[in-house]
Amino acid sequence: MAKEKFSRNKPHVNIGTIGHVDHGKTTLTAAISAVLSRRGLAELKDYDNIDNAPEEKERGITIATSHIEYETDNRHYAHVDCPGHADYVKNMITGAAQMDGAILVVSAADGPMPQTREHILLSRQVGVPYIVVFMNKADMVDDAELLELVEMEIRELLSSYDFPGDDTPIISGSALKALEEAKAGQDGEWSAKIMDLMAAVDSYIPTPTRDTEKDFLMPIEDVFSISGRGTVVTGRIEKGVVKVGDTIEIVGIKDTQTTTVTGVEMFRKEMDQGEAGDNVGVLLRGTKKEEVIRGMVLAKPKSITPHTDFEAEVYILNKDEGGRHTPFFNNYRPQFYVRTTDVTGSIKLADGVEMVMPGENVRITVSLIAPVALEEGTRFAIREGGKTVGSGVVSKIIK
């Protein structure tokens, strides 16, 4: 188990890779790890190690979210490799929420594709504040004008979703070539492009001002039982600080429970405390594994309460964004993805509103079938039949 203390000499930032399936997100993640490991700034993680969820092997499609860590001269990074395939947008919704910034991977050979657009939209909706672009597979494009066109197209697409397209750093390179160089023990032109990318990430994605002053809150992503030690829940601390010995509540879905923190770990290393932005495992005293499920939150006692009914501002995707082709009516019952969980709920439209068309912004009242830890400002996605149909933010709690 974790023994070494986790060092905090460098500021910590959470980033991840997003983009269309097969544009090279996982290869880029492996290339960053390989190039930085040659400089003693990362532990080498190869492609298979990152692409490691068993169910994705036969299709070569990344489903699970992999976490790797590395450093630059300036910062320490936790990097998530987000799923790219449309069927796994659910994971993107929970995964992209873990980012202070994202590296959008776009194949220079193909240009932006439907999922490129969807991931930019999702980044906008789940609050990923900064995007840096890696134009991958540049070794396959001989025409400099074509590269320029793809770059312009990417900038326009970012701007259309309210990201500053004109100011966004776009680095072109080849993740595969960089990976091959690093494996051969060389530092060539392609590895230099990876270093350029990391320099852009270092300078363009600000070190986030952490919410350490606020009340502790951590959405639960996973629950494990460790024999002889008890139950561990993992997730990214959304705000506040948790220390060994703290009394905390487990809120949402079932009745609120109170427990005590007996350990905090990050990347298998023990810490005295975890703070906002950290991906941690929290050991809970006397809590049984079956009492805790994904979608609950750990929180400072009395700081957040479970709710079923709220008002929200939502944007309903149009069909070009992958949304519905038809309107919906009063009492529509989709799923609401809040933090790490999905709960069915019914939608009540405002008086005088007959229906909602794709592409509209509306205020709705939602009634969930199970209570979830909510507060004003909590963001969520609306999903139906395996696709995102809308996105919103809680504007007022009703009950």
From Swiss-Prot:
Reaction equations catalysed: GTP + H2O = GDP + phosphate + H(+)
One GO molecular-function entry: translation elongation factor activity
Start and end residues of each stretch annotated as G4: 136-139
G1, as annotated region: 19-26
Renumbered residue ranges of the record's region G2: 60-64
Main location: cytoplasm
Binding site for GTP: 19-26, 81-85, 136-139
Family matches, as Gene3D superfamilies: P-loop containing nucleotide triphosphate hydrolases, Translation factors
Keyword Cell cycle: no
PROSITE patterns on file: G_TR_1 (PS00301), G_TR_2 (PS51722)
Pfam families registered for this protein in UniProt: GTP_EFTU, GTP_EFTU_D2, GTP_EFTU_D3
Region (G5): 174-176
Entry keyword annotation includes Metal-binding: yes
Function: GTP hydrolase that promotes the GTP-dependent binding of aminoacyl-tRNA to the A-site of ribosomes during protein biosynthesis.
Family: Belongs to the TRAFAC class translation factor GTPase superfamily. Classic translation factor GTPase family. EF-Tu/EF-1A subfamily.
Protein name: Elongation factor Tu
